[in-house]
């Protein structure tokens, strides 16, 4: 994968998250902000989830209240390099915990 392909795929990830939150109808308020390639989700309780791209490694990094995760593209899925879980699984787990209600991005 070259750098432009990596950015195209990361942009698609960001767009999916942003579109899901734009149509979010849950009770919790979840704000989404994108600044310089970093996507920040802010929750009512003051906690945050930060998602950024590591261009030199062609990885997407996810920082949650619980832990940090690094994802490599395997086929068409971003997979955690430690646990083997998908990006969407770990993002939904963290967002659900931090929002206090079920959050889905798929």
From Swiss-Prot:
GO molecular function terms noted in the UniProt entry: ferric iron binding; ferrous iron binding
Gene3D superfamilies, per database record: Frataxin/CyaY (3.30.920.10)
Record InterPro entries: CyaY, Frataxin/CyaY, Frataxin/CyaY_sf, Frataxin_CS
Ribonucleoprotein listed as a keyword: no
Gene Ontology annotations of biological process type: iron-sulfur cluster assembly
Gene Ontology, cellular component aspect: cytosol
Entries under PANTHER family matching the protein: FRATAXIN, FRATAXIN, MITOCHONDRIAL
Function per UniProt: Involved in iron-sulfur (Fe-S) cluster assembly. May act as a regulator of Fe-S biogenesis.
HAMAP family membership: CyaY
Name assigned to this protein: Iron-sulfur cluster assembly protein CyaY
Species: Salmonella paratyphi A (strain AKU_12601)
């Amino acid at each position: 994968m070259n750098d432009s392909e990596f950015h195209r795929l990361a942009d698609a990830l960001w767009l999916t998250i942003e579109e899901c939150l734009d149509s979010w109808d849950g009770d919790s308020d979840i704000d989404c902000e994108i600044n310089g390639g970093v996507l920040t989700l802010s929750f009512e309780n003051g906690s945050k989830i930060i998602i950024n791209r590591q261009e030199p490694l062609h990885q997407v990094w996810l920082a949650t209240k619980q832990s940090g995760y690094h994802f490599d593209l395997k086929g068409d899925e971003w997979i955690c390099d430690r646990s083997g879980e998908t990006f969407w699984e770990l993002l939904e787990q963290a967002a659900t915990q931090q929002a206090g209600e079920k959050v889905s991005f798929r």
